[in-house]
Structures are given as C-alpha cells and as structure tokens.
C-alpha cells in the first residue's frame, strides 16, 4: 500500500495547544478568534502605522500572486513510482500530469528553468524553499513557452515584488497548462531522489483516482528511449533576429569586428534563447534549423560553423541527429552544448549512459584543460562514457562532483563540446569564454579556406 506523507510541520494547525505547569501562575486565556485567519484587533495607538511606499515605476503594473487563500486545504497529490504519496496545495493548471522528477539546486532563475526546453517531460523540484517572489517577466524567457511537465516547491510566495513582473507564477502556469504543487517536504523528496535515483511521478488534483492507480501510471511511463526533441524543435528553418540590447552586449568589440562575417547554423534540439544571444553578441548570423534536417541541406546553407544545441531526453532516442553529426564532422567547426555534447559523443564513436539523479543546478564545479575550476550551470540526465571514446578524442572538462565527462575536443575534426550551459540563464558566467573559443575556431577555418 502506498506510503502517505503528512504535510510539513509548518502547515497551519487549528488544534489548540495546552500547557500546564504547577510552578507558574496561570496565564489569562487568549482571545478566541472565530474567523480564519483572524482579523486584526484594535490597533495600539502607540504603534506606528506602516504606509506602503509609492511605486518607483507607476506605469509598470506589478501584480500579486494569484493564490486563492493561504490557508486552503490540501487538494493535490504527488505520487512517486516507489509508492510514496505527498499531499500538497495546487497552483497553476488543474488535472493530472506524468513525468520524471528531478531536483534543481539553483537559488534564482525559476523563470529561465521553467521555459528551458531541456526540461520537457520532467517535473522540477526546487530545493530553494521560496519560489515565485518576483513573478514572471517578458524579458527572461528562454523559449516561447513553458516546457517542464510540473513544478514542485516547498512554499509559493503569496506576494510578487519586481518592477518587471507582468504576471504571477501561478497565472503563467495556468496560462501554459502546467501543474504545480506546493507545501510538500522538498528536502525529504530530494534526499529520496539522491539515494534512489530519479523517479517517475504523477501530480494530480483529481481526487477520484486511487493512490494505487497513480503508482501504476507512474511505473508505466518512461523517458528512456523516448524522442523528446521532436516535441520541442522548430517546424522549419528561421533566422535568429531577436534584438540584443545593451544588457546582452558583453562582446561589443568582437561583434564590431565580426558582424555578419560568420554564419552559424544551429540544430534546434531545444535551443535556449541565451545561447543564440551569446553567439549574436559576437556578430554571428544565426540560422536555426529543425533537429531532423538532413546534413546535406544544412551544408548547402554554406555555414562557417554548426551548433548542436541543448535539448531534452535520451540521446540514444535520436539516431537521426547522430547520423547528421557524423556527416558534418570534418566539414566545418562544430560546437555541442549539453544534448549536443551527447549527440557528438555518439558521433565520435562513444557511448552514453543515464546518471543516477542527473545534474541540475547552477553550482556544479568543472575543471577545464588549463586546470582552472569553473562553477557551471548544468541540466542533464545522461553523460558520455570517457573510456568508450576513440583515442583521438580528448576529455577536456571533468565534473568535480562525480568525475563524469563534462567536455570533449576532437582537434582533427575541429569539434568542441561541453556537457553544461556556458550561457547560464540562470547561473554563473565562468564558462562564457567557450563561445569566444568557437568563434576563434570558425575564423581560423575560414582563413584556411580562403588560402
């Protein structure tokens, strides 16, 4: 029978607490409130009234979180395939969703994580206890929609305070048909995932389904071997033209000297906007193509370099991407990020495997070829087996948490890959020089071609 877990101890309790001590004088009884929560009593005239400050940007509406009531009853369940059941409060969409539960250790950037296509098919549990306090804005989207299957949080902020906020997190999730659950013991679930590995789960607001039915549904679903990339890739090629304002111009000098001279074709496995912003900041012209576009059609676009982007799921489920990579290797410089790293790893002749609980967060240490340690932003559940690679391929980066392969170079093929996210969003920018390395590689290849 599924094991049920009570809500965390911080949940409001309405049972009276009695204390007795014969050595103390009895205290007068506290006033009994009939309303829940209690209305404020007559204010003390000596107490200074707090007057809210006027908005610094009155023309920008700042909305509060669309939470019905902070004391509403638990109306949602998270059911894991191991039989554990966690009761909580729903926010966002209603209904039932299935996915793989992973935990993310980032303290900021829930909007970027929510809109990262790499999270398609997954429920993201945030280890940060407070989520939703800055709402949702229109500038920090990493794609045009939310992709994660569900959101798990300890506490959903009841107030939104940010001058850029356009809507609350619950409002956005409802708009995007993503279900969320709060007031669950995220620390206990994280420890469970750490010890047992990733687990499939069900989030539901449907009280008619039994726990046993939901456990069976979770066990029947799997992300392994499933082509998730086809669900997030673009339908047809397009030119990246998103304006990059001053806040994104980190390489203005390089952009001025490169503008328009380098053409990058990006295979869209679920590419994040900030990856393209970073390449555009170096003056690259970017054409984004569907994940299944044949290599011959891509090479007909006369690219100076090929980007194999990040994306969701299992690299072994997309053999068409591996075959395209094999056909392109040696023709022009290539750069693989995250899923692109795994696809190129298989194209090099290597193998990939599923990690126990994956790497998800903005605080993962990686050692590069110079010995310098970078703090990186990571989001992946699969990795490349170093001992399966041919001797011509060098492992350039190592994840210092578990020793897994975090980057490769294949000098003869002008190929470089990293298993994590140099563009961050969210996360540190320690690995941003990878984009410049790719640009330098393309410039060198173009000079040789001109000779």
Task: Identify what each model region corresponds to.
Residues 300-375, 381-386, 427-445:
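Cysteine-nucleophile active-site neighborhood
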Residues 372-413, 450-451:
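Catalytic beta-strand/loop cores that center a nucleophilic Ser/Cys/Thr
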Residues 185, 338, 380, 421:
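Active-site glycine-centered loops adjacent to acidic/histidine catalytic or metal-binding residues
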Residues 69-72, 359, 390, 400-401:
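Short solvent-exposed loop/turn micro-motifs enriched in small/polar/acidic residues
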Residues 1-25:
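N-terminal chloroplast transit peptides
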Residues 263-267, 376-377, 416-420:
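Active-site-proximal beta-strand elements of phosphoester/diester hydrolases
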Residues 179, 263, 333-335, 351, ...:
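Proline-centered loop/turn at the N-terminus of a beta-strand
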Residues 2-3, 25, 30-33, 39-301, ...:
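RNA-binding accessory domains that recognize and position tRNA/RNA substrates
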